[in-house]
């Protein structure tokens, strides 16, 4: 029976019913055991493989490996043939009117047809660039969100140049995740960045929930109160003062590299979880317009696309697909090479290490990351370090450059134009108050990191490389040329035998599946009966 005011029914029942169910279950299990006992337990026969006493063992193994490889390639070829046959049948099932239109388009040219098919699945990086350009064009103020742990590495000169060239637009820097760096370091960075652009110290709230909570009994709406947010008032006053000086509505675009906290800043300003946030990089894939009040509208944007010409450490920290493009060991080693080794040892509580591989081995032993045989899983340890450094919990910091110089795309006139219309004195007071309120990281959670400088990004679609996994798959599926199949068949027939030999014990097997190996050995005996093992070797 369903209880009132509750969604789930009660699991209560009478003892008679419960004992009856238990009795039926016992009887069912007894019958299963009885049937299994009648059938008996037959152990699968193990294939002993090629004995060590057999002559030409290495040649047999090579031929078996070669035949297995040829069978796999043949299966792949048959799969491609089936797909092409299905495509041909689909084309035949099209109505006559559609056939006439298809014939006319095919007679014009084949190349435009291929281009149209490819345009249906566009590269997601190009879509990011398109959405980012839309945000910059629609914005009056562009907030470039920087990670306070590496502010210089989060600046993109290409995007800043686009904002400067687009006309009378303002560029403001927001130092997010300010609670993860020491206060002295944060003050030094604030002084360094304020010389060029207005900078706001910010710490986004991480305890946001859904927009509203409703209760059926009271029929009252309870708005959500955000917690642990610093710098919200300073940013509100900065945007509000600029809006009053303009005398019209203002649109604010939020841009930055992945995982710097763009969507978290919007949620903190709105005090609601409107934009999707998470640990994984690149969750925002299209622009999202959020009205803050009647006069100020904020626009969320997808992340910058990092250029492949950057340093390996920058690629590992700023690229969402760095683990896919780079190997985990390479990405984590690039990060580790830029960090202070003594502080890394204190943070991860491992003994001193010689190189990155030695560190990952000790870290895997420390965290209990082992492979099947008990050896340390170095790759899992590298992924663990990469996820911590790209997340929002590890506190590392960089020192600002010793000498200050204008960025290549800035000068004194541009700096004066960018600061015009903002109350910088009030902003300085609010930043000082925010730094005072913030709690710095723990001593063991501070790691000195050597920044690699400005990170180059890609804003133009033509600069994005055309090759991508999705496009290559589409090309393989859509390729209907007959000479490709001939080439593949020729490759299968002309495969050279494997030169490497394997040393095996009498009990070991050569292939992963026993059924495959038995088939291969039987096949060999049918093909070559010139040598008789039973008569010559007893």
From Swiss-Prot:
Q: Which domain of life is it from?
A: Eukaryota
Q: Please list the GO terms describing molecular function.
A: GTP binding; mRNA 5'-UTR binding
Variant or mutagenesis effect after changing residue 261 to V: Abrogates nucleolar localization
GO biological process, any: positive regulation of miRNA transcription
Residues annotated as domain CP-type G: 129-307
Which residues does the annotated region (Basic) include? 2-46
PTM-bearing positions, type N6-acetyllysine? 79
* Keyword match Nucleus: yes
* Positions of the UniProt region annotated as Acidic: 460-532
- Which residues does the annotated region (Intermediate) include? 277-451
What residue spans carry the Basic residues bias annotation? 1-45, 115-125
Localization recorded for this chain is: Nucleus; Nucleus, Nucleolus
Keywords assigned: Acetylation, Coiled coil, GTP-binding, Isopeptide bond, Nucleotide-binding, Nucleus, Phosphoprotein, Ubl conjugation
According to the record, the residues making up region (Disordered) are 1-125, 460-538
Residue ranges annotated as coiled coil are: 54-95
Q: Which PANTHER family match?
A: GTP-BINDING PROTEIN-RELATED, GUANINE NUCLEOTIDE-BINDING PROTEIN-LIKE 3
Q: What is this protein called?
A: Guanine nucleotide-binding protein-like 3
- Give the originating organism: Rattus norvegicus (Rat)
């Amino acid at each position: 029976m369903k209880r009132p005011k509750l969604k789930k029914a009660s699991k209560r029942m009478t003892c008679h019913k419960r004992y009856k169910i238990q009795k039926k279950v016992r009887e069912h299990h007894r019958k299963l055991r009885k049937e299994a006992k009648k059938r008996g337990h037959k152990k699968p026969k193990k294939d002993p493989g090629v004995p060590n006493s057999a002559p030409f063992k290495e040649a047999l193994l090579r031929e078996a490996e070669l035949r297995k490889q040829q069978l796999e390639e043949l299966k792949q070829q048959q799969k491609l043939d089936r797909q092409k046959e299905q495509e041909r049948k689909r084309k035949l099932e099209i109505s006559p009117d559609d056939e006439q239109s298809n014939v006319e388009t095919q007679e014009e040219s084949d190349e435009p047809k291929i281009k149209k098919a490819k345009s249906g699945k566009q590269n997601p990086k190009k879509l990011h660039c398109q959405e980012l350009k839309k945000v910059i064009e629609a914005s009056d103020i562009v907030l470039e969100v920087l990670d306070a742990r590496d502010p210089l590495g989060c600046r993109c000169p290409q995007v800043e140049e686009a904002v400067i060239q687009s006309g009378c637009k303002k560029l403001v820097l927001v130092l997010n995740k300010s609670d993860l760096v020491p206060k002295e370091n944060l003050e030094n960075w604030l002084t360094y960045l304020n010389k060029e652009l207005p900078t706001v110290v910010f710490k986004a709230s991480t305890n946001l929930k859904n927009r509203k909570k409703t209760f059926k009994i009271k029929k009252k709406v309870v708005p959500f109160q955000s917690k642990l947010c610093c710098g919200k008032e300073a940013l509100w006053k900065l945007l509000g003062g600029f809006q009053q000086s303009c005398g019209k509505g203002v649109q604010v675009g939020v841009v930055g590299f992945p995982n710097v906290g763009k969507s978290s800043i919007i949620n903190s300003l709105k005090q609601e979880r409107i934009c999707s946030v998470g640990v994984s990089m690149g969750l925002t894939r299209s622009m999202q317009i959020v009205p803050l009040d009647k006069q100020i509208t904020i626009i969320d944007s997808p992340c910058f696309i990092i250029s492949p010409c950057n340093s390996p450490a920058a690629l590992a920290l700023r690229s969402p697909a760095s683990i896919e493009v780079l190997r985990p060991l390479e990405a984590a080693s690039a990060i580790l090479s830029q960090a202070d080794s003594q502080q890394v040892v204190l943070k991860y509580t491992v003994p001193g290490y010689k190189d990155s591989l030695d560190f990952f081995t000790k870290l895997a032993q420390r965290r209990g990351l082992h492979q099947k045989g008990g050896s340390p899983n170095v790759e899992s340890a590298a992924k663990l370090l990469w996820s911590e450094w790209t997340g929002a919990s590890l506190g590392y910091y960089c020192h600002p450059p010793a000498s200050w110089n204008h960025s290549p795309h800035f000068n004194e006139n541009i700096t004066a134009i960018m600061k015009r219309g903002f109350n910088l004195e009030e902003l300085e007071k609010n930043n000082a108050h925010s730094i005072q309120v913030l709690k710095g990281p723990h001593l063991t959670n501070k790691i000195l990191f050597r920044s690699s400088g400005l990170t180059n990004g890609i804003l133009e679609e033509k600069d994005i490389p055309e090759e991508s996994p999705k496009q290559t798959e589409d090309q393989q599926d859509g390729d209907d040329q007959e000479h490709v199949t001939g080439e593949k068949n020729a490759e299968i027939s002309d495969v050279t035998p494997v030169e490497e030999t394997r040393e095996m014990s009498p009990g070991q097997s050569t292939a992963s599946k026993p059924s495959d190996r038995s088939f291969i050995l039987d096949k060999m005996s049918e093909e070559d009966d010139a040598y008789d093992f039973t008569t010559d070797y007893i």
